[in-house]
Amino acid sequence: MISGVSTASLFMREMNEDALTVLGGLGVKSTEIFLTTLSEYSEDFARLLAARRGELLVNSVHLLNTQFEPQLFGSHPRAKKDAFDILRRAMASAQIFGAKNYTFHGITRLKKNSVPPDAGKLAANFSEISAACAEYGVTLCLENVHWALYNQPGLFRAIHAGCPNLRAVFDVKQARLSCYPYQMYIKDMEGCISHVHLSDVDENGKICL
């Protein structure tokens, strides 16, 4: 097992390119690069990150979900095309700085009356998204997130049945916030976990790590 630190841990303290230098200087061996804005999806910026990463292993890339990920599942052809254009640009960048995995949230589920997910339809969507990522040597990995698509155990396994290339990211904090036992998510993802997001809280519930 290799432990690492996400550039997101330095959000608003260091820009991504500088975060890599800081993490490397601290002796961190592996990282997830969290690209936070559309201008960071460019190949020029990716080359800057590649130059700054030093000996860091870039395990994965994480993108800001609300910028385009929900539209990858949309029915409007123009919006969906634009979303896939952004996806491919981001994956081309990931290929340049060496990320092999894409931590993915997908659809947001912010409304309490959200329609229950259709696993069969979602599997077709995920197959299309996964194929686009694979063009750049990147594996699509669905993360459990309490306010996004995968917010309860059972959904990953149902989607994976129709999209066998899909992998999973287990997030400890998000499992806690979903109010489901974390063991249920681990069981749901069994055999498919790509990487794990760890965090810790103090006695007041404040994130420490």
Which residues does each predicted region cover?
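N-terminal pre-domain/capping segments
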Residues: 1-95, 134, 167
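Acidic-and-aromatic substrate-binding clefts and catalytic sites of carbohydrate-active enzymes
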Residues: 8-16, 34-45, 71, 110-114, ...
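Active-site acidic/histidine proton-transfer and metal-coordination neighborhood
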Residues: 17, 72-167
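Acidic/histidine-rich catalytic cores of soluble enzymes
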Residues: 30-31, 61, 127-209
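Short secondary-structure boundary segments
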Residues: 35, 106, 200
